[in-house]
Amino acid sequence: MRSHRSVKVSLVGAGNIGGTLAYMLGVAGICQELVFVDVMDGVPRGKLLDIGHALAISGVDITAVGGSDYAAIEGSDAIVVTAGLPRKEGMSREDLLMANAAVIKGVAENIRKYSPDAFVIVVTNPLDAMVWYMHQCSGLPVNKVVGMAGVLDSARFSFFLAKHMSVSVSSVSSVVLGGHGDLMLPLLKYSTVGGVSVSDLISCGRLSSEDVHAIIERTRKGGEEIVKLLKSGSAYYAPAASCMNMLESYLFDKRCVIPCSVGLDGKYGVNGGLFVGVPAVIGKNGVEEVIEYVLSQEEREIFEKSVGLISNSVKIISEQK
């Protein structure tokens, strides 16, 4: 898709997700100006040079700036934050909490200084707590700060379900709620294969409860599985693609319903401005609507446990900041 207006997108963090997303943005041509910032000044510059060479093969022009100076993000339409320590094998997201909170604070202060009108997507883990802290430190409106998680979790669930049933993943639609972690909650009555809910597929014997439970567990451990296989590093293709999905919905006012971490104040019974993964309409104004599903008692209990973990992480940050 090619943009019909001047669009500036900035990426903060030049690791694998940031680098992959920069390449995807260049190929898609959805922004006229791309900024890539990292504390390691040469890394974003080197990656952008490599990306420019790759795009030249296809005859695609790109205007991009890389470096360590945050002043370059001034006037950005959208900013994607991937900066932070990566998760290593055996490391929980909670292990990263305070270290990455310090990173987010620094990034947020620069966003507030240079691009207070931007739409900000946070990818840094522990995701839901980091999005909350970004909102707190940046002072941006709650509708302009979101976390990328639910769309990735939903994609993983759809992928594993499609593989198990030997159908195209394009025939699968999934809804995953809750925090980005071990208590993420796929909603079986709203997740479908060929228009038939997973709940109904279980009822008619096409799927067993045991099979679905195994798929859910593999979804929850999807990131960890990749970390173990890679030995060094974590997932980056799917997270980058998830960010693209969110960026396109915002920049082109697509108003797609996308599961992502958003600030809640009453929806799903969550108060206090916590950021939790729920389906939301993303359009030109950022988060334009939160879609609220009716949950069963069991789903409600799992969701509340997930919210409790997020609340605990937020409390730890609040007490130490």
UniProtKB/Swiss-Prot annotation:
Species annotation: Anaplasma phagocytophilum (strain HZ)
Signal peptide: none
Chain positions recorded as NAD(+) binding sites: 13-18, 38, 100, 123-125
EC number(s) stated in the UniProt entry for this protein: 1.1.1.37
Residues that, per the record, bind substrate: 87, 93, 125, 156
Residues forming the catalytic site: 180
GO molecular function, one term: L-lactate dehydrogenase activity
Catalyzed reaction equations: (S)-malate + NAD(+) = oxaloacetate + NADH + H(+)
GO biological process: lactate metabolic process; tricarboxylic acid cycle
Family designation: Belongs to the LDH/MDH superfamily. MDH type 3 family.
The name this protein goes by in its record: Malate dehydrogenase
Matching Pfam families: Ldh_1_C, Ldh_1_N
UniProt KW keywords: NAD, Oxidoreductase, Tricarboxylic acid cycle
Protein's job: Catalyzes the reversible oxidation of malate to oxaloacetate.
SUPFAM superfamilies for the chain: LDH C-terminal domain-like, NAD(P)-binding Rossmann-fold domains
